[in-house]
């Protein structure tokens, strides 16, 4: 099974939809904790309506995959969100199950957040590690090209000069939210 990730960045609504259509995405899973943007066309209500016109399903997954957690049990010793703890949580596991079921039903799913660069976003650092054994993961870039997750992981290992498991932990420390 295949799953995409994408960042809406500051794109126009039309360009963003073109990005999705280029890869036949028919289901957007919004992983933003707060599904609103300074670019109003990416606010939950507006993006949902725009996608519906294009026959693309919109699903808000803030509870399952949002990165701005406040529960103490999901924070590390420094008070930052601990991605491993989030991945072990019941809401996150329900989200994985919903993604798997959707993909099995034939939906072409993309996880959407705001950040254009996947390595700077929790969709890569927090969510992808839970998907990498079940899915082929492709990151849609600004220019509509895709980058294989295996290539992004090579970049991550190179950045931190360590193994992939440790590199994901270091990325967590770098990008995690502090409530």
Where are these regions (language model features)?
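Residues lining hydrophobic/aromatic ligand-binding pockets adjacent to catalytic sites
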Residues: 1-179
